[in-house]
C-alpha cells in the first residue's frame, strides 16, 4: 500500500513494502525528484537498508554457533511495514521481528521509520529497539536514487558532505575490514556514474 504526505512545498509517497520513498514531487514545478525504478538500470527508488548495510562474505554469518543467511543490504527493503501514525506531513511505519526475520537475523527488533516534511526538505529518522534484554548488532542506512533532469553530462559533478569528520568509527581499530573491493568516497568526493 502507498501513503502520501504533503505540505505547501512537497508531496511525498511512501510504499509500505520496505517503507521506501517512491516519489517526491515539488509543488512549485510539479517535478519528480526520486528515481522511478527503471528495472533496466535499477529496480528500486530509495530503500531502507536494515539490519545490514553492505553484505556478509558468502551472504552468511555465524552467531552463537548458528549460521544465518542474509543477502546484501538486509531484508527490511523487501518487507511490509505497518503504519503507526499518519498525519498530513508526517508518516511513521514499523517493522517487527517475526518468524521469517529470525531465520536470517537472530534478534527481536522493532524498526520505526519516520518521514517528516520540513518546508522543502524531507527529514528521515529511524528508531531501532531491541525488544529483548541482550546486545543487538545491526547497521542501518538509506540508498536513495534521484532524478537529475537537465544534466546531459555529469562530468565535473560531485557531492560533498558538510561534516568535519565522518560519524562512523571502527568497532575494533585493530581489525581490518575484509571483502570490500572498491572505494566509493575519496578525496574528491562521492563518485557518480551516469547511466
Each language-model region and where it sits:
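Beta-strand-rich recognition/accessory modules
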Residues: 1-6, 98, 110, 190-192
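Beta-strand-rich N-terminal accessory domains
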Residues: 1-63, 67-71
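Hydrophobic residues embedded in beta-strands of well-ordered beta-sheets
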Residues: 3, 91, 122-124
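Residues that act as N-cap/strand-start positions at coil-to-secondary-structure junctions
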Residues: 6-8, 18, 55, 75-78, ...
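Broad, structure-driven detector of short, well-ordered beta-strand segments within folded domains
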Residues: 10-14, 113-115, 159
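Extended, loop-rich substrate-binding clefts of extracytoplasmic carbohydrate-active enzymes
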Residues: 66, 70-119
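Acidic, contiguous internal or C-terminal segments within carbohydrate-active enzymes
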Residues: 97-151
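Active-site/ligand-binding surface loops and adjacent short beta/alpha elements
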Residues: 137, 145-193
Amino acid at each position: 500500500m502507498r501513503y502520501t504526505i504533503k505540505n505547501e512545498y512537497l508531496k511525498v509517497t511512501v510504499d509500505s513494502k520496505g517503507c521506501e520513498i517512491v516519489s517526491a514531487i515539488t509543488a512549485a514545478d510539479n517535478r519528480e525528484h526520486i528515481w522511478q525504478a527503471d528495472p533496466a538500470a535499477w529496480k528500486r527508488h530509495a530503500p531502507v537498508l536494515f539490519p545490514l548495510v553492505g553484505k556478509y562474505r558468502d551472504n552468511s554469518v555465524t552467531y552463537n554457533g548458528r549460521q544465518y543467511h542474509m543477502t546484501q543490504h538486509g531484508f527490511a527493503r523487501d518487507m511490509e511495514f505497518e503504519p503507526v501514525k499518519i498525519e498530513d506531513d508526517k508518516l511513521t511505519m514499523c517493522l517487527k521481528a517475526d518468524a521469517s526475520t529470525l531465520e536470517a537475523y537472530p534478534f527481536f527488533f522493532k524498526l520505526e521509520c519516520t518521514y517528516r516534511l520540513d518546508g522543502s526538505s524531507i527529514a528521515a529518522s529511524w528508531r531501532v529497539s531491541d525488544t529483548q534484554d541482550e546486545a543487538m548488532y545491526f547497521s542501518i542506512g538509506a540508498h536513495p536514487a534521484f532524478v537529475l533532469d537537465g544534466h546531459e553530462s555529469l562530468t565535473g559533478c560531485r557531492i560533498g558532505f558538510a561534516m568535519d569528520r565522518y560519524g562512523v568509527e571502527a568497532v575494533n581499530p585493530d581489525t581490518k575490514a575484509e571483502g570490500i573491493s572498491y572505494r566509493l568516497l575519496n578525496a574528491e568526493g562521492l563518485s557518480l556514474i551516469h547511466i
